[in-house]
Design a protein with these regions (language model features):
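Catalytic phosphate-handling regions of large nucleic-acid enzymes and associated NTPases
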Residues: 1-223, 279, 474-478
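Charged, surface-exposed alpha-helical interface/stalk elements
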Residues: 200-478
Length: 478
């Protein structure tokens, strides 16, 4: 019996090389598929899949977070816990979460002092008005690929009108890389983009955290600093702002430390939603000044920006937010140009279709249908008669074979011819293309401001009705 040498012909692979290759594969996977946001749309894959799923199911209105999780898992090859948390994160709107939440919510999704949301089966959400405004207008340009099991299609990247990672900030840690992108104000972003389009010069933008009432500082090392601030009302002193990363448990630990040091006797936390209001109670006979309290109890929090993003060529580290804006604005110019190319193609097709309908009616090709054996023979006849839209014409109802239909199509041809001429004029002129982008940015700015103003009014209406007000919390040393 001959030995099968092929069983032993595989070359030996050193263990070190095998481990390095597997580590590299895992590194690429964590970066590209989980941890780091993409430059094109500012989203991580899980966030993109959530928003795309909501967009496809937007006619359903509010859906349970648990139900949405199940829908997203058809695209996302990971467990439900991470998807549920990503949904909650996209919907949260308290200070230091999202300046512009992409998901509208119903139920308790957490607040500034108590960030933990209710269970997924008790809370509901839908695609947010911000996402509707920014994300889905250019879906005919979005590249679609099969999902992980090749059963449905999903987008490689969306084409937002503004950079989402700069609007809401982004954080992620992958193998060998991390990303820490602070958030910025949409008005500053839009002004900077318009400046770059019109003059080629980008305007600097400053970090912005919605509802944060103190000054956001940047030190000489580039760290972004937020701090605890105090106010005095009569003889009482209150904490009225806390740094990034401080929730109730961290604040209480900080206050309890000062109680242990006998600087503080007690405190009453009356904070609600984004409004921080913690009354400090000192021992009888102790009346520290506001300055003394700030010096003794004040704390700061800092973040070091790290603008690491995924690009078409892989991982890229940007040095400033303005550098990201430059690349993103160039992308928007190309998207605007492609939009008009597609519009021209669409209107050319419309003109051809309307002209064929007129010829079909005037030459009475519909009368030939009764002489054909079946629909296929009739379509073959129309195709031989040089009708490109033969199938559409074969399905036209007989009541439309009238002068009225011809007149309607002639009117459409006039309108479409005029629009087509305008689109071609814009496409041929770089200046007009840039102006269209500027007009779009200005329009987006107004609409986004209106959306956020309406959200603020709605929040005030809820508070006026006593919707989410919690009772003051008194914390005392045991």
């Amino acid at each position: 019996m001959k030995e099968n040498k092929s069983l032993h012909s595989m070359a030996a692979v050193p263990l070190e090389a095998l481990v390095k290759e597997e580590y590299r594969t895992y590194q690429i996977y964590t970066l590209m598929d989980r941890a780091i946001p993409y430059l094109q749309d500012g989203l991580k894959p899980s966030q993109r899949r959530i928003l795309f799923t909501l967009w496809k199911n937007s006619n359903k209105g509010l859906v349970k977070v648990s139900s949405l999780t199940g829908l997203v898992l058809t695209l996302h090859p990971h467990g439900p816990a991470s998807v549920e948390q990503s949904i909650v994160n996209l919907a949260q709107d308290y200070t230091f979460s999202n300046n512009y939440p992409l998901i509208d919510k119903k139920g308790y999704f957490g607040e500034r002092m108590e960030t933990q949301a209710a269970a997924a089966r008790y809370i509901e959400c839908k695609l947010g008005k911000v996402a509707e405004l920014l994300l889905f207008d250019d879906m005919n340009q979005v590249v679609m690929v099969p999902n992980y099991d090749e059963k449905v299609m999903e987008p490689v990247g969306l084409l937002p009108k503004l950079p989402i990672m700069l609007l809401n900030g982004a954080e992620g840690i992958g193998t060998g890389f991390s990303s820490v992108v602070p958030s910025f104000n949409h008005e500053d972003i839009i002004k900077s983009m318009i400046s770059f389009v019109e003059t080629g010069k980008i305007k600097k933008i400053k970090p912005y955290f919605r509802y944060y009432t103190d000054k956001v500082e940047t030190d000489e090392k580039g760290r972004i600093i937020t701090r605890m601030s105090f106010k005095q009302v009569g003889e009482k002193i209150f904490i009225n702002e806390v740094p990034r990363g401080y929730d109730s448990s961290k604040i209480y630990r900080h206050l309890n430390k000062h109680m242990d040091n006998d600087f503080l006797k007690d405190y009453i936390d009356s904070s609600v939603d984004n409004m921080i209001n913690v009354e400090l109670i000192f021992k009888r006979g102790q009346s520290p000044t506001l300055k003394e309290v700030e010096t003794t109890m004040g704390v700061i929090s800092s973040i070091v920006p790290n603008y690491t993003l995924i690009t078409e060529k892989g991982v890229k580290v940007f040095h400033t937010p303005e550098e990201i804006l430059e690349v993103f604005t160039v992308q928007r110019v190309l998207v605007t140009k492609r939009r008009y190319e597609l519009l021209i193609k669409d209107y050319e097709d419309r003109l051809m279709k309307n002209n064929e309908i007129i010829r079909f009616i005037k030459e009475k090709h519909y009368a030939i249908a009764e002489k054909k054996a079946n629909r296929k023979d009739y379509i073959d006849y129309l195709s031989k008669s040089k009708f490109f839209y033969a199938e559409y014409l074969a399905d036209m109802a007989i009541y439309r074979m009238t002068k009225e239909e011809v007149e309607k199509r002639l009117l459409l041809i006039k309108e479409e011819t005029s629009a087509l001429a305008e689109f071609r004029k814009i496409l041929k002129s770089p200046a007009l293309l840039k102006q269209k982008l500027v007009d779009e940015l200005e329009d987006v700015g107004k609409k986004l401001s209106a959306i956020m103003d309406e959200k603020e009014k709605e929040k005030k209406r809820v508070f006026a009705k006593g919707g989410t007000v919690k009772p003051p919390t008194t914390r005392t040393r045991q």
